[in-house]
């Protein structure tokens, strides 16, 4: 995939998530590529906090062990496979025809997008402060939930977006 194709996929993910899901599914990535992408997503996750870590004083980071790069990697290494399995199981239970590789590619891509949005939010927060950071992070989570609903609807082949909403809720709750 070229840089222009990647940029278009990022834009489509935010503006036309169903088209982005179709594009991701059509890539038909093999399991070794998916595992590599998952590892990349896990390892890159701490970079979303890089601006905060670089430009914050040591005093402001007291008690911030939960957000250390090692902890972020450990949590992501546990959560990402669980999230993929949860979405796949929920899609199947709700009558969808989702394939594991299709669910994996959209979940991994969505998590990479969340990391990108968190990084951008952290950069903006350097200028705008912590209140702006909280606002941008909340907006990022809402956007990602909307993207998850659209992606799950496409990969599971549901006939109703409301079934996908329920699927996303069940995947995160269960």
Residue ranges and their predicted role:
Residues 36-48, 109-114, 171-174:
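Alpha-helical transmembrane segments of multi-pass integral membrane proteins
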């Amino acid at each position: 995939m070229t840089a222009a194709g990647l940029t278009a996929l990022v834009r489509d993910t935010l503006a036309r998530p169903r088209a982005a899901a179709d594009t991701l599914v059509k890539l038909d990535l093999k399991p070794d590529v998916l595992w590599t992408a998952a590892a990349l997503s896990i390892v890159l996750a701490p970079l979303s906090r890089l601006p905060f870590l670089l430009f914050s004083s040591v005093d402001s980071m007291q008690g911030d062990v939960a957000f250390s790069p090692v902890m972020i990697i450990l949590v992501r290494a546990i959560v990402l496979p669980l999230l993929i399995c949860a979405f796949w199981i929920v899609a199947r239970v709700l009558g969808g025809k989702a394939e594991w590789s299709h669910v994996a590619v959209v979940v991994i891509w969505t998590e990479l997008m969340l990391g990108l949005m968190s990084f951008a939010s952290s950069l903006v927060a350097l200028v705008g402060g912590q209140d702006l950071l909280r606002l941008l992070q909340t907006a990022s989570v809402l956007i990602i939930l909307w993207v998850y609903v659209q992606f799950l609807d496409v990969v599971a082949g549901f006939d109703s977006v409301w079934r996908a909403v329920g699927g996303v809720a069940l995947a995160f709750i269960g």
